[in-house]
Amino acid sequence: MWSPRIVALCLLAAFGTQYALASAELPFGFPITAHFPFLLDSYENKREYVSYSIFRASSACPLPMTAAKNTSHSQSTILQKQQITSSSTASVTNLATLNSYQAVEDIKYFIQQQNKASGETNPKWIVYGGYYGGSLALWFRQQYPGLSVGAVASSAPALAALDFYRYQKNVEDAYQAYDQSCYNNLASAVTEVRHLIQSVKGRKKLSDTLRLSPAFDKLSLVESDFQFFYVVLLSFLQYPVQFNKVNWGPFSTSGGIADVCKLLKDNSVKDLDKVKNIVSYMIGLGGGDFSNSNLPNNYTQLVGWLADESNGGQMRNFLWQQCNELGFFTTTDYGSGGLFGSSIPNNFWINVCEDVFGKSFDVDNLKAGVKKSKSTYGASSTYTGKNAFIVRNMVDPWRTLGHITVSDPTSSIYNASGSAFTADLQPPSNNDVVSVKMARNLINRRIKQWISGSNNKRAYESNHIAEEKKTSKDMQGEIKASSWETEINWHEKLPTEFEKVPHPKTPYIPNIKKRHNLLDVFKHKMGDELYQKERVKVSEKAGSGFIRSGSIKQNVDHFDSKNNDVYRQFFMLNDQYDDGSQLVFLMIGGEAPIDPFFIGSEYIAMVQWGAEYGALLLELEHRFYGRSQPTEDLSVPNLKYLHSEQALADAAVFINKVNKDRNYTTPRWIAFGGSYPGSLSAWIRLKYPSLIYASIASSAPVQAKTDYFEYMQTVQNSTRAFGTKTCMSDVHKFFAWAQQQMTTVAGRNGMATLFGLCNKWDTDYIDPKDAEFFLGMFVYQIAGTVQYDDEGHSRLQKRCKWFEQVDQYLGAYTKQISFTGDDTEEHQQIVKQFSTGLQQMLWGSVRAGDEDDCFPFSYQIILDELRQDTPYYTDERCWIWQTCNELGVAQSTNFGYNIFESTLPVNHFMDLCYDVYGKDRDYVDAHVRATNADYGGQDYYNGTQVVFVNGSEDPWNPLSVYNPKDKSVSSFLIDGSSHCEDMFILGDYDTKAVKKAHRAIKKILKSWVSA
């Protein structure tokens, strides 16, 4: 009779028994199964699904036995193997219960049933596994600690991730760490491939050399074709790293980093042939023959195979889990420093999910699944369970998604240097590195401790780190004492119109990440004529002395007692309505100079309410914008002082000084702000509640997020909802045409001529960043229109008509030009005729024919502009720094099929962070996490007495607060309204939704004022 005292439960998690922990749990990737026959045999022929494997503690790991609920078993064999017959299909309906939550419950049920069957009163179960099985072991241990005494996990990606860009970067870093010259040769070979793929003759060379099937000239050459090519190619570089020196299959003695580097360092071989040799070597490693093989090069075939419910095998099953809860998609979304640029954005994998499982399996479904996973198992890199031993194999690219610290001293993490994917769980080998042997010894030691019940803390090597805490405590005590000892000047000269007037030859800088200026909102809303009239009125108020400017001495650093540098921060005030009640309305400045308009125009809601309630109106300029410059220049070392925490401390010191200077004893300050200043108004109430009584946060994106694809997703949704009937198709038609033109020299050159670019793009290779930023300019046009759309959506519909006209124009051009030879006079005349008309439509003038009047557009020009570190030169340098250093908000098109194609990968923005400031994606991600930990983000905002107001059309609304934690916090989403609409007074043109929200906001404001 089977009655074990100690049981080890190995979690193989739905993969073939033949390959135990390592083989079948490969990350999703078509190429590896296409070229390793022994894997393909497992997927296609055996069709054997194994959920869990039971091993006796004293055994030498016999073949595992499958466990399944409600399956009869004998005393001699716990559970028999269950073969999945060909009639069982992996349909979406059948896959509905394939998820980690069900798997954890299966483990629970299995253990309970075995305990019951064995009659043991004190069984000691140890759960262990590698890769996803390791994650299950850790999750089960967290969820049901009473059913096991410990867990062992190796190479366990326990943290769900929408975009696992770090996998590929870890691969590249591994080659560089092994041998710099190997890495340099790899970089050279990759560069050659990226150059060749841009031209017809280059693609033919790639097709012939790498035996692509089908060849590029047989494909329609849409973005997914190029992306899939790179997915295939990268797999041959990834697996030598993932399985480096792992005692499994062919990798036990070959196929590692050293073997690939040997091929790369053969300088007698040309770059492309080095790539071919690596592909040939890896295929041969799996028993194949490259000379008789064809490299798959057809995205349509891939998704067709995976969509076949009876054919996709385990890859279809695990893809299901990736698309629904785990993510784990390996991309090149790292930014500068990655060898493959933006070749595989997360867009590719989201499209795969939709194409394989259906349109409902989109980015929203994936995002919700990843969020649920993090909510269930934890989003922190700190493991909170007890009695767990986690092995991080430091060559394994998956290590980044594993836990790196523990919160309980009975758990430990061992960083196995030089070790790769689940190496410690494989049979011992002479090829094992020292750390693998050590890992096995430590595992044995831990298991003995768990079995003996020796849980004293001294028995463990602890990596204890406390969880990050969300805070809402008053921050006054953290500002250094000298900051409060300040001076204020109430009589500074008012500036003239401060906005920079660009020189006619200044290159176009895209409004990257949509730097906000409330003046732009007003101009769009009310029109230039009314705006100019209002400016005259505001100037008259300033002339009569109601509106004045002042300054306050502020510390450059409010938190470093060793830094005594100070600067002048400017503010403006309007005391026209001040009735002496000590009520103050503070308009917080943001990423633009302050302007008397915001405290002087009666079209601004705060001004109207200030007049009604007798408030003093103040406006405080944000450090590093306008005249408030803390440092001599905008160099990166100085930009560290440009931070929201420093800005909030500025405001706190300012409020305190005003209270003292005006002898306020019972002041009541209410903060206002829109967009980023809206976030500041919410955060200042969170951090300094004793100084700020309440806040109104308009269009406030309080959630920091690196890849903010929801921005462009909202632009698309708003275009669908409020644009013309054909707007979606017209916009998509333009970008599809533009992407197609970029695939050939003639197409690129034709576009450059049509649009009047100085660079004619007439070479086989162009910098992909030039094309990316050029097309991005058109994305920004429609995005900016949506962000600042009017209530009737006439601005958006006008922009839609513009795209419709451009499409018609380009269609006529393409039709006419197809009947002429490239070098004929007739051809040149048609190009000139159409380029003249098109440039009139785009720029309002003709910018071709004269070199001095062409359009100076390139990525390098943009970098040169943004690298200028002279104050007053550009607010863009400061704002983009804030996004790289705190906020993220990269407005990518990484949300699956969309009207913009894959025009703006997240690297579009990550490259700027690196190329302008030297900050890579790891830096950006870490600082985004810090921002959310500091302020709580949208889900854990703990402030009180705040009103959040957003418009459903506004692309920034997804980052605001909608489920407040405190009943004193209100949230309004105004249907059909866009950015900061609520900050203006009501007019006849306003919709019912806007009027209703305005009344509700004013009611809350009145309660604060009269309390």
Give short role names for the model-derived ranges:
Residues 72, 77-81, 157, 419, ...:
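Short beta-to-alpha linker loops that shape the active-site pocket of alpha/beta-hydrolase fold enzymes
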Residues 81-93, 162, 624-637, 982:
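Glycine-rich "HGGG/HGxG" loop immediately N-terminal to the catalytic nucleophile
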